[in-house]
Design a protein with these regions (language model features):
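Class I SAM-dependent methyltransferase SAM/SAH-binding core
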Residues: 45-97
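A short SAM/SAH-binding and catalytic strip from SAM-dependent methyltransferases
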Residues: 108-126
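A short glycine-rich, Lys/Arg-flanked "PGG" loop and its adjoining helix->strand segment in the class I
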Residues: 126-140
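Conserved beta-strand signature within the Rossmann-like core of class I S-adenosyl-L-methionine
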Residues: 140-149
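Conserved class I S-adenosyl-L-methionine
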Residues: 34-43, 60
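Class I SAM-dependent methyltransferase Rossmann-like catalytic core
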Residues: 1-32
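A short acidic, Gly/Pro-enriched loop at the edge of an enzyme's catalytic core
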Residues: 98-111
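C-terminal lobe and adjacent flexible extensions of AdoMet/dcAdoMet transferase-like proteins
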Residues: 187, 191-368
Length: 368
């Protein structure tokens, strides 16, 4: 079982400061005054000040019993908050929320899952449970959103490493694959070297420079996430790499949040507010994801690209280390895309790559 808590990092960590910037930006963009927000895997609520500043009306914190939620509940009850709160102790990707949540008149306007989605894709059953719980939590018209490692970026970097390894030729063994990605800022290591790449449960360790230990994640297969979200009653809105999120929103947020990216000795942006290369590299490892629970009383939402159940037996996609790897890998469900929805999905894929967004230079050129 993977822990719901990442290792502690110093405040000046490049990764941590960039993620905090994006979390603050998402809250500023999506949370209206007096909104009801739900925070999945809230831990000891490190974002308490953000919720205070957002002037929310009600807070729902959910995490496993060992997360320290009970301590937060006691602390919040001992002081007067401007908003009400409730805390539920259970694992939302394993247990049914109906067994724990009795105050259902307080459905959420927004459900956040900040950096913990990879904990829920170890199996298809876990992801299904999470998404059905999210759908139960949300009001019609409400949003489910958060931040997760960008599988498109990570997988593309990994396959480029494998391609380069085999292009060396000569004494290289054909069935041996490098299992790590390295940069000056981080190292990504896959736990198992194998030719198969399952849709669920593909584990890897992400360790940033200066960290004592790495974080264990599972790659998120975005087509499966979109399909299962739709089954749970959630429509796809957007999946956007954080480099693009920063570029799209920096003009609006720079004045408000620039101080989060600059301090006396660890600037993450240049004088014009543009990300430095090391910041861009780290930020590009992550993506936002946004889904919406449709409201039948309002204009019908845009249809989520439909991936039919078909023969979804989730056979592992075979990895072939050659020039055509982009076309071969993670394509088992391509044949299940019906013609009437292919244009919508193609648009997403052309823009984002078949696993998610990723920086432009790492995107796949072949649309589904």
């Amino acid at each position: 079982m993977m822990s719901s808590f990442p290792p502690h990092r110093p405040a000046e960590s490049t990764h941590q400061r960039l993620i905090e910037f994006v979390k603050t930006a998402l809250i500023n963009i999506f949370v209206s005054p007096y909104a009801t927000v739900c925070d999945l895997y809230c831990g000891k609520v490190p974002d308490e000040e953000k919720w205070d500043e957002a002037q929310i009306g009600h807070y729902i914190g959910i995490d496993v019993t060992t997360s320290g939620v009970s301590e937060v509940r006691e602390a919040w009850e001992s002081r007067r908050k401007a908003y009400t709160s409730e805390f539920l102790e259970f694992d939302p990707c394993i247990e049914d929320i109906d067994m724990h949540w009795k105050n259902k008149e307080n459905q959420a306007d927004i459900v956040f899952c900040m950096q913990h989605l990879p904990l829920c894709v170890e199996t298809e059953e876990k992801l299904k449970r999470l998404l059905h719980n999210v759908s139960s939590l949300l009001k019609p018209g409400g949003y489910f959103l958060g931040i997760t490692p960008d599988s498109s970026t990570i997988w593309a970097k990994y396959q480029k490493n494998v391609e380069a390894y085999h292009n060396k030729g000569g004494g290289m063994k054909p069935n041996i694959f490098p299992n790590s990605i390295r940069s000056e800022s981080y190292m990504i290591t896959f736990e198992v070297e194998e030719e198969k790449f399952p849709f669920f449960g593909k584990k890897y360790q992400l360790k940033f420079a200066g960290d004592m230990s790495g974080e264990t994640h599972c790659l998120v297969h975005f087509p499966s996430l979109i399909r299962l979200a739709r089954e749970a009653g959630l429509d796809y809105v957007e999946i956007q790499n954080l480099t693009e999120f920063y570029d799209d929103n920096s003009w609006l947020l720079r004045a408000q949040l620039a101080g989060m990216l600059v301090d006396a000795g660890h600037n993450l942006v240049d004088q014009r507010g543009r990300l430095l290369q090391r910041s861009y590299d780290v930020l590009g490892l992550y993506t936002t994801f946004i889904f919406q629970k449709p409201d039948p009383d309002i204009t019908p939402p845009l249809m989520t690209p439909l991936l039919e159940d078909g023969s979804h037996n989730h056979d592992e996609a075979t990895f072939i280390p050659q020039r055509d790897w982009q076309v071969v890998s993670w394509r088992e469900d391509d044949k299940n895309v019906p013609p009437e929805s292919s244009s919508g999905l193609t648009k997403i894929i052309e823009q984002k790559g078949i696993l998610g967004p990723g920086p432009a230079e790492l995107r796949f050129s072949d649309a589904i």
